[in-house]
Amino acid sequence: MAAAVGLRGLAVAGGGESTDSEDDGWEIGYLDRASQKLTGLLPTEEKNETFKKALTTGDISLVEELLDSGISIDSSFRYGWTPLMYAASVANVELVRVLLDRGANASFDKDKQTILITACSARGSEEQILKCVELLLSRNADPNVACRRLMTPVMYAARAGHPQVVAVLVAYGAEVNTQDENGYTALTWAARQGHKNVILKLLELGADKMLQTKDGKTPSEIAKRNKHLEIFNFLSLSLNPLEGKLQQLTKEETICKLLTTVSDKEKDHIFSSYAAFEDLEIFLHGLGLEHMTDLLKERDITLRHLLTMRKDEFTKNGITSRDQQKILAALKELEVEEIKFGELPEVAKLEISGDEFLNFLLKLNKQCGHLITAVQNIITELPVNSHKIVLEWASPQNFTSVCEELVSNVEDLSEEVCKLKDLIQKLQNERENDPTHIPSMDEVSSWNNRILKRTAFTVCGFGFLLFICKLTFQRK
């Protein structure tokens, strides 16, 4: 066979499911154009080898020539992969289009590994993957068919960090809250991998952030376990007012809106045009940043996105340093960080200064103040009458049970703080009564001040007494 073979490559099954051998029968290299003219004279086995090389190099004209010579569009190569599956695995859009136009089966699967799943986990840019996925969906590929591990295409797209692909899959009917064999949803996979933009998109599309894995973990807890603390804090915020917004639209309206948003290549962060900005306007007004409203609306930046922006994203979106400082200061006030046990003062080892312990108590008190303010705000905003609630709520019993747990925890906290106060008072009393206690500089300074004051008062009194005595003596 007249082919100058370069590197030998491994075509990896979509979703990270590797094959059983290091050689899958694919040769990645360059074809001698002279050999292409002899395709009509090649035996079937050599035609298949030439066909594989043409697919590997993306030589569309040779692929079409081989198909015209009678080679099957659904040829089965080693491990059962078809030409379309391989083209999808490398996100070759033009090759996928040619094969589909020639009659390739978009719904083919090999051991439940579908072509759509292969495309969603392909190697390539999101733009190329998105086009491949759109082509397959337009040829009736089912977005809800799962692999052997019960992972669906939207889970693979979320795990790979492709928010636009996720949006298109959902627009074509993909279920966002399906769970795999471990109880992971698409949102859980995005949280595990730290893909913030995918999480934003999934929440807008109605993803349930309270669904738990088989070991009882929510997406926020999965994010925390994998050191994505920004996402953990973000998912721990109150419910998103836009959550499930798309589900109110018809399929045609959803596809139109999502594809319109996706086609804008100049935007790094994709947010749909249907988002509401009331919360954003209120937030900006409270900071005196009303002038930013139009800028953020033009860039389709929601409040949820704004609250999770990094400093470089602020600059990229035209937000000035002064405005950045106001937003970051507000976020710092809103943020209630979890205190890690490893960061607590080592009181038992007596390695803590008074200032450090005081700072710890002040920080704890400030966090309690934030929690009180948050609850007060919720009480103020909560509708008094049930008919004023626009969104569908779960059973009120769920809310009341959580509130009861909160009350119990607050009572426990109060009890523990009282114990801490009594302990500190006891230590203080013992310290004052300890004869071996060496007073600190502050105590010495305070004692010296008291001595000086008493001495001055005594001298003044004695002088005044002498003056009275002298005056009396002169009168006599």
Swiss-Prot record:
InterPro entries cross-referenced by the UniProt entry: Ankyrin_rpt, Ankyrin_rpt-contain_sf, Asz1_SAM, SAM, SAM/pointed_sf
ANK repeat ranges per the UniProt record: 46-75, 79-108, 111-145, 149-178, 182-211, 215-244
Highest rank taxon of the organism: Eukaryota
Record domain SAM: where: 273-335
Residue positions where Phosphoserine is found in the record: S18, S21
Subcellular location: Cytoplasm
Pfam families attached to this UniProt entry: Ank_2, Ank_4, SAM_2
GO CC terms, sorted: pi-body
Keywords: ANK repeat, Cytoplasm, Developmental protein, Differentiation, Meiosis, Phosphoprotein, Repeat, RNA-mediated gene silencing, Spermatogenesis
GO BP term, pick one: spermatogenesis
SMART domains: ANK
Described function: Plays a central role during spermatogenesis by repressing transposable elements and preventing their mobilization, which is essential for the germline integrity. Acts via the piRNA metabolic process, which mediates the repression of transposable elements during meiosis by forming complexes composed of piRNAs and Piwi proteins and governs the methylation and subsequent repression of transposons. Its association with pi-bodies suggests a participation in the primary piRNAs metabolic process.
Subunit annotation: Interacts with DDX4, PIWIL1, RANBP9 and TDRD1.
The name this protein goes by in its record: Ankyrin repeat, SAM and basic leucine zipper domain-containing protein 1
Organism whose genome encodes this protein: Dasypus novemcinctus (Nine-banded armadillo)
Lineage: Eukaryota, Metazoa, Chordata, Craniata, Vertebrata
Gene (name only): ASZ1
